[in-house]
A protein has these predicted regions:
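Residues in well-ordered beta-strands of folded domains
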Residues: 36, 223, 240
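Short, histidine-centered active-site or binding-site loop motifs used for metal coordination
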Residues: 39, 173-177, 243
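Conserved core of the PLP fold type I
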Residues: 59, 64-200, 210-231, 237
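N-terminal "arm"/small-domain region of PLP-dependent enzymes with the aminotransferase-like
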Residues: 1-71, 76, 83, 244-247
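PLP-dependent aminotransferase class I/II
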Residues: 235-248
Length: 248
């Protein structure tokens, strides 16, 4: 009887062990207070509100709640998300411009799948989110690290790297960078958008932490600022998340 060895796709040669998953395994141990994983405090979950909303959805529209839906997401939800984003300054994002994904990680995977070919240059902050590195490398990206300081990515250096490498995209976490915690200044945010237009380069703005702040609100997102820089909106992919403020 002939035995066939299982042959995986070549792209899986780029897959590395997830450091984040290894860290999360520690959370199951008693007495652990983890500063490593981005878990929201479970005591803050609105369990009663989520239970009530789930029961109402099943009572009022059971077929719609349990049936297949549109790929881009449930339309009333996208309408609510459009209003939510408008309240945060991104006032002209129509529901039809939104896609609902299973976490922003799926959005990043879709961007990698649709935008990155093997060998493409992709600029990321140094350091940046580990899961994004793994995701983009899976699709064969050649990652280029852009230096940062307390005000986020250094835009002079970013321009130099864009001009030199002509990347397929630039991935940034402007608000409370992970793992740096850096906050991209308002001046640099505008400059990033100007660079996108100047070099016709896609900017991916990952914004899972924009609602988590004490005291003064952070600067507007790149998405909210984009109307001030003509031509930049079409070169911007914004990834938001409810995982930190509602529940994962």
């Amino acid at each position: 009887r002939h035995q066939h060895a299982m042959q995986f796709a070549d792209r899986l040669n780029n897959v590395e062990t997830s450091a984040i998953r290894e860290l999360f395994k520690l959370l199951g141990k008693p007495g652990i207070i983890s500063f490593a994983g981005g878990f929201p405090d479970s005591a803050m979950f609105d369990v009663d509100g989520i239970r009530e909303a789930s029961q109402r959805a099943l009572a009022e529209e059971p077929g719609g709640a349990l049936q297949y839906g549109a790929t881009e997401g449930y339309e009333p939800l996208r309408e609510q998300l459009s209003a939510f984003m408008a309240a945060k300054g991104a006032k002209d994002v129509a529901p039809g411009q939104l896609i609902v994904t299973t976490g922003s990680q799926q959005a990043l995977d879709l961007l990698g799948k649709t935008m990155i070919s093997p060998g493409d240059k992709v600029i990321v902050e140094g350091p940046t989110f580990l899961a994004t590195i793994q995701c983009f490398r899976l699709y064969g990206a050649d990652l280029v690290s852009a230096p940062i300081d307390g005000q986020g990515v250094k835009t002079d250096e970013l321009e130099r790297l864009i001009a030199e490498h002509r990347p397929k995209l630039v991935y940034l976490i402007p608000t409370f960078g992970n793992p740096s915690g850096a906050m991209l200044s308002l001046e640099r945010r505008r400059r990033v958008l100007e660079l996108a237009v100047k070099y016709q380069t896609l900017i991916v703005e990952d914004d899972p932490y924009g609602d988590l702040y004490f005291g003064e609100a952070p600067p507007p997102s790149l998405l909210a600022l984009s109307p001030q820089v003509p031509g930049s909106r079409d070169l911007l992919a914004h990834c938001g998340s409810l995982s930190k403020v509602l529940s994962p």
